[in-house]
Amino acid sequence: MAVTPSPARGRLIALDARQMRIAIGGSPAPLEQLEPWEDFERSQGRPLFGRYAYEVDSKTVAVIALYRYSMARWPFLWAKHGPVWLGEQSPTREAELRKLLVREVRRRDKRVVFIRMHARFCARDTLPLMSSITYDRTYVIDLRPGTPEAIRAAMPKDGRRGVRRAERVAREAGCTIAEETGLSREEFESVYQVLIATAERDGFRPHPSQVYWDMLTTLGPQHARLFVLRRDGVPHCWDLVTVAGKDAATYYGASSNASRSFRGAEALDWAVACTLAKEGIRSLDLMGAESTRVPELYGVGRYKRRFAQHPTEVDGAWDVPTRPVVYQALGRARRTRHLVRKWLGR
């Protein structure tokens, strides 16, 4: 077992999958930091860099799994929704963990330009993401009440009215909602077309369909499930839901333009929540809402807030440079490229 000592109290210890699983024990942990996620990352050509425990006074305070990514051919590491904190999460401990990780990465692979990881506290070494978007606030539907009536009663007033109306309007429009996790590759391609329409409407670029298919197949039905709303047999909305223990998240979703007329997305999200609650799942994370750091999510946040009385604060992602000079140069190159594309109207 490799050990990286520190002049401070903490130390970084390399773990294998079993050791990390034992360290987490029964504590809630995001799927991206658990062992099953490794198969999905590998399917995308992103191998595991390593798993580590951060120990303070011989007690495991946090664990983290990092995967190899690249940007413009420059390698970086990403610990999605990591580290998982098992003890007190203080600014000092966060900073020491980052320091230990930077030292370890430089020792193992000097090519790595930065580490992308999550932190509660902003610091000098935590920089805004060079690419992608993060969030530090979300809405989580509490499914512990168990029944649709009890779950709905815990929602805001406009949310209670909204899901009732969505159920009724979708039903009157002849919509059906079902889990289709075991669908064929050909069947999934027709479902994927809904995401193409969503991307064109909302102005983003979706992953190729193979990425979503790989997520379903590598994670398996225990950890990745697909729910689809159809009208006259045609898919109009879908949610790809991930499950880790007793917690679930709507990882990806899509809705057709036509579905707005019969409130398809809202009807589907509500049906998924009720289905998961019946199975004993305790929460459904809608994954992302606006905050002062991420105002871009205001629109989706307005929709999601109807499902929960209050937002839930989560740790946002940050870039932690391991090669600061190269990181700065990479950032300048990206900004220049974006300016050129804007000037060319592309």
Q: What positions do the PLM features span?
A:
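Active-site/acyl-donor-binding loops of N-acyltransferases
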Residues: 2-17, 40, 49-50, 120, ...
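A conserved beta-strand-loop-helix scaffold within acyl/acetyltransferase catalytic domains
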Residues: 8-57, 61-73, 119-138, 146-261
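Conserved strand-to-helix beginnings and helix N-cap segments that scaffold or border functional pockets
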Residues: 69, 91-95, 297
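N-terminal cap/recognition module
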Residues: 72-80
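Residues at the N-termini of beta-strands
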Residues: 76, 111-114, 247, 283
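A short, internal acetyl-CoA/4′-phosphopantetheine-binding micro-motif in the GNAT/acyltransferase core
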Residues: 80-91, 145-146, 253-262, 290-292
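A gly/proline- and charged-residue-enriched helix-loop-helix capping module
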Residues: 83-124
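Aromatic (often tryptophan-rich) hydrophobic motifs at membrane interfaces
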Residues: 99-104, 213-328
